[in-house]
């Protein structure tokens, strides 16, 4: 897209290619510059001792570049699966790869529809990361929630 905009703006083919590559590098670097919530890394390290951990993401950040891929046994991205949450394809991939039943899986996420409702409808146990400490916006759904990453291991043990 950036390449085509440069061509339309009157830049030559080679210059447009170079500018598009440079723009993508800047975007990729920015997309993989992450500030973690307090306690999130320590919590994943602790959970990894007792559970198999995976990521189901619509995002395009590279966990290896970020430096946290070692915390997860499975990574399911929308780009790899050609689907986005709440599409059941995302959750079916988890079942297929892990060999677990849906009822054995806790899905932790911050989006009421894409994470909580979708995983619940698939038969998983959703846990809502409610960092803004607001009421759950969807009626008729009882959901386990947390706002402090340090509290997550105890919440999971209670389920």
Features from the language model and the residues they span:
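A metal-dependent, Asp-based hydrolase signature
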Residues: 1-24
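Alpha-helix C-capping/helix-to-loop hinge sites
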Residues: 5-9, 30, 78-79
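Asp-based, Mg2+/Mn2+-dependent phosphohydrolase catalytic module
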Residues: 14-17, 41, 45-46, 51-159
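Surface-exposed cleft-lining segments at the edges of enzyme active sites
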Residues: 25-34
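Active-site core of PLP-dependent enzymes with the aminotransferase class I/II
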Residues: 37-38
